[in-house]
Amino acid sequence: MPYIGASNLSEHSFVNLKEKHAITHKGTSSSVASLQTPPSPDQENHIDNELENYDTSLSDVSTPNKKEGDEFEQSLRDTFASFRKTKPPPPLDFEQPRLPSTASSSVDSTVSSPLTDEDIKELEFLPNESTHSYSYNPLSPNSLAVRLRILKRSLEIIIQNPSMLLEPTPDDLPPLKEFAGRRSSLPRTSASANHLMNRNKSQIWNTTSATLNAFVNNTSSSSAASSALSNKKPGTPVFPNLDPTHSQTFHRANSLAYLPSILPEQDPLLKHNNSLFRGDYGNNISPERPSFRQPFKDQTSNLRNSSLLNERAYQEDETFLPHHGPSMDLLNEQRANLKSLLNLLNETLEKNTSERASDLHMISLFNLNKLMLGDPKKNNSERDKRTEKLKKILLDSLAEPFFEHYNFIGDNPIADTDELKEEIDEFTGSGDTTAITDIRPQQDYGRILRTFTSTKNSAPQAIFTCSQEDPWQFRAANDLACLVFGISQNAIRALTLMDLIHTDSRNFVLHKLLSTEGQEMVFTGEIIGIVQPETLSSSKVVWASFWAKRKNGLLVCVFEKVPCDYVDVLLNLDDFGAENIVDKCELLSDGPTLSSSSTLSLPKMASSPTGSKLEYSLERKILEKSYTKPTSTENRNGDENQLDGDSHSEPSLSSSPVRSKKSVKFANDIKDVKSISQSLAKLMDDVRNGVVFDPDDDLLPMPIKVCNHINETRYFTLNHLSYNIPCAVSSTVLEDELKLKIHSLPYQAGLFIVDSHTLDIVSSNKSILKNMFGYHFAELVGKSITEIIPSFPKFLQFINDKYPALDITLHKNKGLVLTEHFFRKIQAEIMGDRKSFYTSVGIDGLHRDGCEIKIDFQLRVMNSKVILLWVTHSRDVVFEEYNTNPSQLKMLKESELSLMSSASSSASSSKKSSSRISTGTLKDMSNLSTYEDLAHRTNKLKYEIGDDSRAHSQSTLSEQEQVPLENDKDSGEMMLADPEMKHKLELARIYSRDKSQFVKEGNFKVDENLIISKISLSPSTESLADSKSSGKGLSPLEEEKLIDENATENGLAGSPKDEDGIIMTNKRGNQPVSTFLRTPEKNIGAQKHVKKFSDFVSLQKMGEGAYGKVNLCIHKKNRYIVVIKMIFKERILVDTWVRDRKLGTIPSEIQIMATLNKKPHENILRLLDFFEDDDYYYIETPVHGETGCIDLFDLIEFKTNMTEFEAKLIFKQVVAGIKHLHDQGIVHRDIKDENVIVDSKGFVKIIDFGSAAYVKSGPFDVFVGTIDYAAPEVLGGNPYEGQPQDIWAIGILLYTVVFKENPFYNIDEILEGDLKFNNAEEVSEDCIELIKSILNRCVPKRPTIDDINNDKWLVI
């Protein structure tokens, strides 16, 4: 589901209205010291009253039996009694006065009133204006991130508290009925005994409740991460043993609205494990967290008891557990399973690697028959039972409703607690519900999708601008467009839009362009075939979603490659029977089968019951294929993930023989189109029999009539396994045959906006509506959602009857999220078979042709009038490497490269190549028409680059990567003899796993004095961190030279040096100790063919992107630790290669970094050395921060209480770094939050110079990255100079740091939208004025970097 929220204004007014309303309730005025004193009689009476209300609210809740219900009720009373008797914990620092919440003049947007025509008009265009409103990519962040992060946090809690795993889990599904009113019970059940601290033996918990209870109270959001008892004063830490900021996985944090049911299971071990919750987490409760939407209050109170998170948070969970026997074996196995799943989630969410697409997709389809934890080949019934219980726990966590208020993470606890109190009173029937309905409504629908977005977890998008008229000549493109389509930057000027469209899709695209003349929106995510060089020599089609809009005389196009299965069917022209079927994707077949006797089962028009044997066998096959270990790296990278459909790796199943059904055999089995698609066959029969006809049909022969009607209808369903799947069909009449090209998307999801009262569809994404349900937008807008989800009203009615607290029309439920698995669970309850939830494959949706398809949907309450549905259709597939990009090396001609020198000044280095390229050769350079002629040069160029690299390189990538990373870690840690170094690296590893720990006060603190001292250094002097003068009269450069000479004499060249530049050795003599390398090599690149990656041991994977990956490594011999960036040679854009007089033919990134080394700057990452082999360039850079670092994207996400002064210090360093670049005649061209890293002291480094260029090389046609940071003149297709565009980007960066969201969300807003500021934000006027001046669309009026550096807001 996308991160969809309401506007800043409406959200803030909602907070203040809640606060104002809740203050009128009783029991909210107790003092802060109430935690340290026993409850007053009035407070005790209030607790008793709340318990009475709770009893009433749960009077109709079904429990397993009466005894259990009595135990549950008694446990609540006992825990409240224990709360009264409990000795309070040591007091925290609450001396500082609390700042009052600032009232807002804006009004609440949740007031119930009919949707006006203006509302409907505005909402109608939203789902089609942005590429964030649809997704065909299982890796897309707007698909699963919210659900997976809930699951991730649950896993972390179970792993850190392994005693939970010893509790037996009942086989029966806890009925959702027990969740009724749980929002009101949340504070009482979880906080009554300070969570787990004072639990007594009468308390009843199960794994799910303990896990999610911890998760709820460990999430800092409005619903569950503030003061919990309604009678406590705001800010009182009722959970001193848990840190509410510990699980800030996203600044749009989620909070579970309801805890799972509490079942009668004892926990004998947890009582020994209290220190887990009293440890380092306990002292980190902040008495005041500034509002996320008011992030820059004058906050003077700091934590005094905070301490540095250490390994105990991750290791102490074993302290009090049995260390031998069956119990320990069980724990070890279960924890290993959970850690395996957690690692998978972390890697997929953080690094967005396409190799994990199948795994992520499987989690999105998660049910009991999926996601095998462990080796599926082992037949262990006990293990299977435990795994099944574990999966049930995870499923239950995915089904939990939660609230998501984007402004509430890190919010003022006053607003948090008062809102919670109001909702408790409303749930239980107490309190005063005064005039909330007489407030004038105000909507800002335009900001539904404008929440904080970034490219960090986004799939690569190719962006073009071209002319609006035929032939649609390209004007500009981004670098990813060159990478995706395999073209050079110079070739763009000679290409047209149709050159990139596959011949099978050109008619469709051309018709769409012509039929939408005069309209702004042209494409809204339609699926088309595109051209890549590899597709010219193969029949394999590459598919992409296509979004396009006319703006300012240009057509702006966005392509994103997507997984798509397709099949070609040739029909004879006599009886339209199937003559030949080419099914390389095995869309119509069932692929490898477990039994040679298996046959394809064709479903009926309606979906067959779920959980069929055939479906389960497919799931089993997929899982076994996923867990089949490749025999070598080549097999893993080559066979399983090959884009070419001619080669498929078959899973080696030890238990059963495997038979692959090839398309040629399958084609002989299918003669009737009805076997492929009943709805398609019916249309063809109706046309042939005259039931369906057009006025012009009488003049046309039958094949053309059939072809025209198929193309007009286009969207059908295929008979696929146990249920139907949607598809699109295009037809072409050939000489003797009718060709059908059928394509079907294994994953698609999109936004639907629905009136919550009438359930009419207000708007939806047009492409998703067609591809998933077969309807055109005009056919369904304004009609009921039951047209496509027939059971939707039944679900809502059931929820309103059984769980009235979840009524989507209630004011208080704004921000309520009902997940996909929640509706699966509701469906199971309606069916009277709660266990079926665990094997559910989705909800029935209705296609236009009358066939049922399986879908899932997530519901979000925008306000009491509008709900947002994120509807998903997905099926079980193992995604191949659909995102493979063609090699750029085929286009490289060294004779045409610019000649530069890293040793000279920027002026001479920026000389452009004098050779001009004729227009006639540009087509050849595009590689679209001469693939065969250029292909043979690939290997030759690959080995020629860098002067005899093949002869000198002593290892290949496959040899290096055969050593597993875990073994690398073990051997690397053996080299770390220094305990302090081990400790630092372990902290860095912990922080990389859980970035919320990095930004805690105990670790992260912006050091003002350090930053000011660094900024004040002259850029021309050597970095103090790298080489400090020893006081002997030598300059830093002279001293470094002397040190290097001495090191060479002693055989320690390349060894690490300390802060004084002294070679660090251990007691054994010349053997160096492990340390962080800071000083560059004397002659960078001198060992580029000698040094190899196998000389290093990888300690940690740090990231992966479109062009390469990054690892933390230690040198085996010299024991120095560096960060190595590995750049794929085949993905280096042909236009970014340069010939350096000293360094040879290298990527411009290395050349520019080497040039910057001559005049280093504190805020720019230095180049230590580089080397290469056949596949990669390896760039060595210093480690930033001894305990790791975090990029600005994550800092904004997790550092929710950042002050304006801290933001100023960080931004000032960015400005200083960019100023140094501009002074050297260099433009960065890819400034964004991900390319700014920050250490634990707030010290900043600018990284990633892969797109950097010299100013004199401009003007530039190709821009870098995605739309978010692109300047309007760049999107307008105009050549740009570089520096003003860097300025625009840092303006976007500043706005993002201050307001936690991008200022512009789509192309319209970038080109002509007003710059909006939230009046409720307590941001200084000077800061706002600076942002306004930077984000000026008039390029001449945009300030220079010197103007910004001297701005009064940046004066410190």
UniProtKB/Swiss-Prot annotation:
One of its GO terms (molecular function) is protein serine kinase activity. Residues 1096-1354 form the Protein kinase domain. Residues 20-115, 592-612, 627-660, 948-972, 1021-1066 are annotated as: Disordered. It is found in: Cytoplasm. Disulfide bonds: none annotated. It catalyses: L-seryl-[protein] + ATP = O-phospho-L-seryl-[protein] + ADP + H(+); L-threonyl-[protein] + ATP = O-phospho-L-threonyl-[protein] + ADP + H(+). Its EC number is 2.7.11.1. Pfam families: Pkinase (PF00069). CDD domains: PAS, STKc_PASK. It is an enzyme of class 2 (transferase). The active site is at D1230. SUPFAM superfamilies: Protein kinase-like (PK-like), PYP-like sensor domain (PAS domain). The modification Phosphothreonine is found at T1079. Present with 967 molecules/cell in log phase SD medium. Serine/threonine-protein kinase involved in the control of sugar metabolism and translation. Phosphorylates UGP1, which is required for normal glycogen and beta-(1,6)-glucan synthesis. This phosphorylation shifts glucose partitioning toward cell wall glucan synthesis at the expense of glycogen synthesis. This is Serine/threonine-protein kinase PSK1. It comes from Saccharomyces cerevisiae (strain ATCC 204508 / S288c).
